[in-house]
């Protein structure tokens, strides 16, 4: 039977009415199958998450010892400006993550006043060395304690240093090997003090940290002794910083007993 162009199929009949918002709530999954529709979003999300993680790990400033994550020790280093030197083997560091590339010293200022620095620096104990003890708590100063302090000030105060951190000590200081750039060379601060006879190799029975440099430190100490440099050339009976501390600790215990 011939079908007229304007005729309709017998199956064509009234269509069931659709709810007005059916098409609004329907998810077009075909849209998400197209890479061009979801790849940019995935890349943007991944980039943002990576940037946040990078900032938290490498660019977030650490204002004090208590803010250092335990996982950082023996894995990370701290870069910053030395703001004060309190003794022959310790100082305070203002953490400047990223250095000049992150804007420090030209876009972001580093405080210099003591009041502005309060609670914002990290105390650092130089690993592997022991400098002569200065006078404090009513105790006499050791020979060459003033020279050791003066050398450390002239060598690192106001300079940027990198500290490879190992642990936190009983005084809430960070123990680490400290490096400073002098002209075009990077110098191990502790090693330079030993070479000049201004510090001994750290000889405590527990808590000694060397970062794999103990042999190098002891060789440098032997040379300084042989040349009678610094404290090794002093007259009279030699008392190491460790022996000095042990003597005063024994005296304090005897007074309490």
From Swiss-Prot:
GO terms for cellular component: membrane; mitochondrion. Ca(2+) binds at residue 130. One of its GO terms (molecular function) is endonuclease activity. The active site is at residues 125, 133, 173. Residues 76-234 form the TNase-like domain. InterPro entries: SNase_OB-fold_sf, Staphylococal_nuclease_OB-fold. The gene is LCL3. Residues 236-246 have a biased composition (Basic and acidic residues). Keywords: Calcium, Endonuclease, Hydrolase, Membrane, Metal-binding, Mitochondrion, Nuclease, Transmembrane, Transmembrane helix. It is a single-pass membrane protein. This is Probable endonuclease LCL3. It comes from Pyricularia oryzae (strain 70-15 / ATCC MYA-4617 / FGSC 8958) (Rice blast fungus). Its EC number is 3.1.-.-. Its main location: mitochondrion. The chain crosses the membrane at residues 39-55. Residues 236-257 are annotated as: Disordered. It holds the Pfam family SNase. Belongs to the LCL3 family. It is found in: Mitochondrion; Membrane. It is an enzyme of class 3 (hydrolase).
